[in-house]
Curated annotation (Swiss-Prot):
This is Voltage-gated potassium channel regulatory subunit KCNG2. Residues 1-187, 253-263, 318-332, 426-480 are cytoplasmic. Residues 210-230, 285-296, 355-369, 390-396 are extracellular. The chain crosses the membrane at residues 188-209, 231-252, 264-284, 297-317, 333-354, 397-425. It comes from Rattus norvegicus (Rat). One of its GO terms (molecular function) is voltage-gated potassium channel activity. Its main location: membrane. Residues 370-381, 382-389 dip into the membrane without crossing it. Regulatory alpha-subunit of the voltage-gated potassium (Kv) channel which, when coassembled with KCNB1, can modulate the kinetics and conductance-voltage relationship. Modulates channel activity by shifting the threshold and the half-maximal activation to more negative values. Potassium channel subunit that does not form functional channels by itself. A motif (Selectivity filter) lies at residues 382-387. CDD domains: BTB_POZ_Kv6_KCNG.
Length: 480
C-alpha cells in the first residue's frame, strides 16, 4: 500500500490536514473528499457531512497519521487522494442519497439485515430510515429471530464428518437414509414412498370398513365372519409394513433418542402400539377370558381408534402438510391471540344474549350463561347450527353484533398466518429442491487430486508467457 506523504503534526493545525495533503489546491481538498466503496467512487463535500454527519467519515477527517488512518479505512491512494472502503457499494448508494437528499431508504437489492450492519459500520442510526423502510427492517428482524428460534428440519444429508466415513456400515446407512428420507434420490426412494402412501390409503379404507354396522354387530356378538377375518388380515399386513418402516427409519437415524422425540416418530408409535396391545391382551385372556375382555373392551376400542393417526403419516411425503405443521409451530403466538379474542368476545356476548332471551324475552333456549357460551362460539365463527336461535329483538341485535365482531376478530390474525404459511412453503420447497439436486461424493483422495491439479496448473501458467501476462493484468487490491 502506498504510504501517506509525511506531514509533521503542527500544534493548532486544521484537523485532517495530514490526510488532505498532496498535489493540487489545498482549498479544494479541504472542501471535498473522494470515497471509493467497493468500486463505487463518490466525491463528497465536507459541508454535506456537516448536515448529516457520518461517524466513520468524521473520524477520517480527524486522522493525522498513517496508522490512525488505517484504523478507519481499508486503503488510501496517494496519487488520487482517494480513500478505499471494502464494503457494500449498494448500501453506500443509499447513504449517499441520505447525504444529498436527506432521506434514507431501504433498497430492494441488498438484504435488510446486511443493510442494517452497513448502517452500524458507517455510524448511522436506524431511526433515520423512512417509516415504511423501518417497518420492513423490523419485520425482517422478527423473521430472522423466528428462524433462529425454530429448530431446523432434519434432512437426508449428514454432517461433513459423517459423509467422509469410508466404512461399509456408514455407506449402508447413507444409502438407507436416501431411500427412506429422500424420495428424489433414485428409483428405490420413489418406490418406497409410493408403497408407504399406498399402505396409508389401504389402512384408511380398512378403518372405514371396520365401522360398518354389520361388522360392529358381529364384533359385539363375538362372531368372526369372513369379512371380519379379511379386515384383520389387512390390518395385520399394514401394521407389519409400518413397523418395518419405523425400524428402517430408526436404523438410519444418527441419534436414536433425537429420532424418537420427533413428532412423526411419536405419531408412528401411537398408531402402531394399540394393535400390539390389543393382540397381546387377546392372547393373554385366552378362550376363558371373555369377562376380562369385556372390562377392557372400552380401553381397547379407544386405543384402536388411534389408527386414524396413520393419515398423519402422509406428512412425510406431502409438502403441503409439512408446511402446515411448520406454520402451526411458528404461529403459536397468532393462534393464542385468536383464542384470546374469541374468549373475550364469548365472555361478553354470552351473558348479553342470556339476559335478552331469558330475562326479557322469557325464552327457554338460553337456559344459562354456560349454555349461551356454545351459541356465542358458533355465531362468532359464522357456523350457525340453528339449535339455539334468539327470537326477541334485543337478542337478535346481540346476535348481529356477535356475528360481525366474529368476522372482524377472525380476520385480524389470518393475514399473518397466511404470510407465514407462504414463507414456510417456499422454504420447504427450496430445501426439497436442494435435496433432489445431485451432490458430488466426497472421497478421501479428493484433496490430493486437487493439490496435484493445482500444482500442474501453476507449472503450465509459469511456462506460458501469454497466460502469465493475462494473469498479471488482472486488477487486484492495493498492497503495502
Amino acid at each position: 500500500m502506498a504510504r501517506l506523504p509525511g506531514h509533521p503534526e503542527v500544534p493548532g493545525a486544521e484537523p485532517g490536514s495530514a490526510v488532505r495533503g498532496g498535489r493540487g489546491g489545498r482549498g479544494a481538498r479541504a472542501r471535498h473528499v473522494i470515497i471509493n466503496v467497493g468500486g463505487c467512487r463518490v466525491r463528497l463535500a465536507w459541508a454535506a457531512l456537516a448536515r448529516c454527519p457520518l461517524a466513520r467519515l468524521e473520524r477520517l477527517r480527524a486522522c493525522r497519521g498513517h496508522d490512525e488512518l488505517l484504523r478507519v479505512c481499508d486503503d488510501y491512494d496517494v496519487s488520487r487522494d482517494e480513500f478505499f472502503f471494502d464494503r457494500s457499494p449498494c448500501a453506500f448508494r443509499a447513504i449517499v442519497a441520505l447525504l444529498r437528499a436527506g432521506k434514507l431508504r431501504l433498497l430492494r437489492g441488498p438484504c435488510a439485515l446486511a443493510f442494517r450492519d452497513e448502517l452500524a459500520y458507517w455510524g448511522i442510526d436506524e431511526a433515520r430510515l423512512e417509516r415504511c423502510c423501518l417497518r420492513r427492517l423490523r419485520r425482517r428482524e422478527e423473521e430472522a429471530a423466528e428462524a433462529r428460534a425454530t429448530p431446523p428440519a432434519r434432512g437426508p444429508q449428514t454432517s461433513p464428518g459423517r459423509a467422509l466415513g469410508s466404512g461399509r456400515l456408514e455407506r449402508g446407512r447413507r444409502r438407507l437414509r436416501d431411500v427412506v428420507e429422500n424420495p428424489h434420490s433414485g428409483l428405490a426412494g420413489k418406490l418406497f414412498a409410493y408403497v408407504s402412501v399406498a399402505f396409508v390409503a389401504v389402512t384408511a379404507v380398512g378403518l372405514c370398513l371396520s365401522t360398518m354396522p354389520d361388522v360392529r354387530a358381529e364384533e359385539e356378538r363375538g362372531e368372526c365372519s369372513t369379512k371380519c377375518r379379511n379386515l384383520f388380515v389387512l390390518e395385520t399386513v399394514c401394521v407389519a409394513w409400518f413397523s418395518f418402516e419405523f425400524l428402517l427409519r430408526s436404523l438410519q437415524a444418527e441419534s436414536k433418542c433425537a429420532f424418537l422425540r420427533t413428532p412423526l416418530a411419536i405419531i408412528d408409535i401411537l398408531a402402531i402400539l394399540p394393535f400390539y396391545v390389543s393382540l397381546l391382551a387377546g392372547l393373554a385372556a385366552g378362550p376363558t377370558g371373555s369377562k376380562m375382555l369385556e372390562r377392557a373392551g372400552l380401553v381397547l376400542r379407544l386405543l384402536r381408534a388411534l389408527r386414524v393417526l396413520y393419515v398423519m403419516r402422509l406428512a412425510r411425503h406431502s409438502l403441503g402438510l409439512r408446511s402446515l405443521g411448520l406454520t402451526v409451530r411458528r404461529c403459536a403466538r397468532e393462534f393464542g391471540l385468536l383464542l384470546l379474542f374469541l374468549c373475550v368476545a364469548m365472555a361478553l356476548f354470552a351473558p348479553l344474549v342470556h339476559l335478552a332471551e331469558r330475562e326479557l324475552g322469557a325464552h327457554r333456549d338460553f337456559s344459562s350463561v354456560p349454555a349461551s357460551y356454545w351459541w356465542a362460539v358458533i355465531s362468532m365463527t359464522t357456523v350457525g347450527y340453528g339449535d339455539m336461535v334468539p327470537r326477541s329483538l334485543p337478542g337478535q341485535v346481540v346476535a348481529l353484533s356477535s356475528i360481525l365482531s366474529g368476522i372482524l376478530l377472525m380476520a385480524f390474525p389470518v393475514t399473518s398466518i397466511f404470510h407465514t404459511f407462504s414463507r414456510s412453503y417456499s422454504e420447504l420447497k427450496e430445501q426439497q429442491q436442494r435435496a433432489a439436486s445431485p451432490e458430488p461424493v466426497l472421497r478421501e483422495d479428493s484433496t490430493r487430486d486437487d493439490s496435484t491439479r493445482s500444482a500442474s496448473a501453476t507449472e503450465d501458467s509459469s511456462q506460458d508467457p501469454e497466460t502469465a501476462g493475462a494473469a498479471g493484468s488482472l486488477p487486484g487490491p492495493v498492497g503495502p
